[in-house]
Every structure is written in structure tokens, then in C-alpha cells.
Amino acid sequence: MQEIELKFQIPPASRASLSESLRDAASATTRLRARYFDTGDRLLARSAFALRLRQEGEGWVQTLKGRGDGLMTRLEHNAPLGTDSGDAAPALSLERHAGTPAGAALLALLDSTGRTPADLVLQFSTDIIRTHAEVEADGAVVELALDVGQIAGGGQTLPVWEIEFELVRGAPTGLLSIAYLWTEAFGLWLDARSKAERGDRLARGVTQGDVPAVRPVDAAQPWSRQVAVALSPVLALVGDVADDLASPAQRVALAQALGVLAQTLRAEAQAAGAADTVAALAGMVFDAAIWCRVETQALWLSLLEWSLPADAR
């Protein structure tokens, strides 16, 4: 299964009003306690996988996530384990993901590096209160999930205040429409960093992520695919830049990635105006406030729509 979702950080000034709005949308609340696993040298994190055991209400679910085929998609498989273990976390078992694309991808990764499931050990944990509700727009049903809590690892904790928009059914453009409305109302800013990535950093005692490779796009590919490839390293970096955590190397990479993205956009008349805006942003990589503005988020959402294949719009 592939999930289609976007995640945003919530500025402190908007947290109370957003929480109230979500409660008004016939929401439910669940406590989610999770334990994340990886090899000692972070093989899963380095390969864009996340493997966790999470208590959801009275039961546990083992979840495996991996890289999908688009900017808003990820491989995912959930294996409910029932309520027999109570509050005690059950043992991890990759057999629960047997016969699924996500499970096959993880086993291939372990085999290719000479690892076994026994090499997967606990790295960090999360304790989250999730308030969630479903909303409709443009023929799509989208689940909104407000997550408030903390990540713990390496003897440290990190607060969490974020909201996810996940497509339940309908076209991805409906998800983008709903995300824009909430972004405009509450000043949200797009953040591609998952809890797994942030927890991995916390466990290692580092604040910045890796510097993604910035490569020219293949002009022979469909234009939507070119936009997706050019946008990927940009979205991988904007979370650290907006948090004012980015290293000099990350900022240089972001400026380079924005240059590639602007050049890609200029190939299409409909994106000419956006190309100029993207090029201007390349000169503002040291101004964290720029990356949190509603106008910047609207730009990312437009680019994400252009990155969708024609039959998905």
C-alpha cells in the first residue's frame, strides 16, 4: 500500500485555535506510544525506511514505511497485533510484513548489506496524543491528524506539535486544497522530516539532517516527473532551514536545488512566474522567516500539484 500525505509544523501562536477547530470537526483522540527500530549504523534511516511498534488505544500495531514513487507517497504496511500484550510492547517480527511490497523492500535491503532481522534494535520512542477527524473538499476525503507530545532518544526529548493531512479517498488535488486552506488559516509550514528522522537525529545527538544530492533533471522525462525530481531535495531541506537549524552545507545545497528547480519550471509556460519566485528564494537561504510564510507554502503546494502525473490530478 502507498499512503499519500503531507505534514506541517504549527507555529506556537496558532496551536490553541487550530486545536479548537479540529475538535469542532467531530474529532476523536488517541494516545500513541511508539518504539522505533534500526541497525546500529542507521541502515534503515539512511535508506528512507521506518520500522515501529506502536500502541494505539488498547492494541499494538507494527508498521513498516519505505520510500514511495512520488513526493507525497510512501510504501506502508500496518500489521495489527491485537490487545493480548496489554501495555507491554510485543516482540518485533518482520514476518508480519511478509508478502508486501514494503516487507520485500526491507528484506532486500538487509540481504544486500549482509544484515539480518536480529540486527534491528530499539533506537528511540515517541509518546503522542493524536486528535483526528475527516474532512471533505473537491470530492476528496482527507484525514487530519494533530499530533502533540514528545520524542525521546539518546537521553534527550524533543517536543512535537504537527498536523498531517492524509488522503483517504479521492484525488490528491483535494488533499492539496484542504492543506492550503488550513495553511492559510493557521500559518502552517511544510516539513518533510518524519518523526522517525527527527528521532534518529535525537538518538545520535545531532540537529541537522544529511545533505541531499542535487542533480540535473532528465529532460526526456515527463515534465511532472522533472518537477518531482527537482523539488525532492528542496523539500528535504526546508524543514531545517525554517527551524533555523541548517548547516552552511545544507544552505548551499538548497540554493543549488532551487536553481535546478527554477530552470525546470521555465520549460513550461504555466510555471514561468513560479520559476522567478523560486530563483529569488535561492538568495534567501539564511532568512528562516521566508520559509515559514504562507506565500512560500502556497508555492510548495502548487509545485506538488505540478509534480503529479496527469492522470492523478
PLM regions with names:
Residues M1-R313:
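Function-determining surface determinants
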